[in-house]
């Protein structure tokens, strides 16, 4: 009886520890990044993506993204401890030590590099490693504590997944892949600044120079509106370039107009609740936009003239 209880207790501790390590990888953010990478894989070929590339490539990108987020948690552990939104993270509470986090990140990164080398190609491996450095070092260490434009300048690393997926299949990164990167790059500021606005009290504690803290609410709202317009323009590039048809065009315009409606309402009559709804919609927006792009890829509709 004692042995069984001890065994159950050990299993419970292991499960808790596994959840804590998983939390370091920011699973929700990683899922969206890998989803966009997988869409990039399918858009790179008119047929089916080879299963080995699909599974091995996606896993490799997932692991390297998780490694980058773990380093982010490590670097920002003291900042996270000050913020209500992030104080629970195991790096902030000290439940997982600095050494353990470094080892965990190294294992994830090494495994991800190996998977991409074996199941994708070296171009994808090195591009993903460069993305890891861009997020973990350039954004987290250099840009985020230095400038309120951190999310704009550092947004390239977060926008890379479609190009990584594309290169995993084709071994190249053509203009079409960069259109997808540009969409996410222009989507990132209004997405993140909506969060920063309704969490501005938290960010004020952190000491980080976030735009709502350094330039105020009104300035940030204007930038959300302007970047939303730029983002909508960027989403039209796949249609203009001929890589998508009318199914995507209609969806891109419809989804974009809803996003613009949120941005305009925020600018006219701000509330934390509306900013939170805008942030949540932005995640749904990107997911639906890329999903429709995939549907359009296989069922492209272009009316005959």
From Swiss-Prot:
Signal peptide: none
EC number: 2.5.1.141
Pfam families linked: UbiA (PF01040)
GO MF annotation list: protoheme IX farnesyltransferase activity
Transmembrane domains' residue ranges: 29-49, 51-71, 101-121, 123-143, 151-171, 177-197, 221-241, 244-264, 283-303
Entry annotated with the keyword Transmembrane: yes
Chief location of this protein within or outside the cell: membrane
Gene Ontology, cellular component aspect: plasma membrane
PANTHER family linked: 4-HYDROXYBENZOATE SOLANESYLTRANSFERASE, PROTOHEME IX FARNESYLTRANSFERASE, MITOCHONDRIAL
Pathway named in the protein's UniProt entry: Porphyrin-containing compound metabolism; heme O biosynthesis; heme O from protoheme: step 1/1
Gene3D superfamilies per record: UbiA prenyltransferase
Membrane topology: Multi-pass membrane protein
UniProt keyword terms in alphabetical order: Cell inner membrane, Cell membrane, Heme biosynthesis, Membrane, Transferase, Transmembrane, Transmembrane helix
Gene: ctaB
Name of the molecule in the record: Protoheme IX farnesyltransferase
Species name: Cupriavidus metallidurans (strain ATCC 43123 / DSM 2839 / NBRC 102507 / CH34) (Ralstonia metallidurans)
Record-stated family: Belongs to the UbiA prenyltransferase family. Protoheme IX farnesyltransferase subfamily.
Biological role: Converts heme B (protoheme IX) to heme O by substitution of the vinyl group on carbon 2 of heme B porphyrin ring with a hydroxyethyl farnesyl side group.
Miscellaneous section: Carbon 2 of the heme B porphyrin ring is defined according to the Fischer nomenclature.
Protein location: Cell inner membrane
UniProt-listed GO biological process terms: heme O biosynthetic process
Chemical reaction(s) catalysed: heme b + (2E,6E)-farnesyl diphosphate + H2O = Fe(II)-heme o + diphosphate
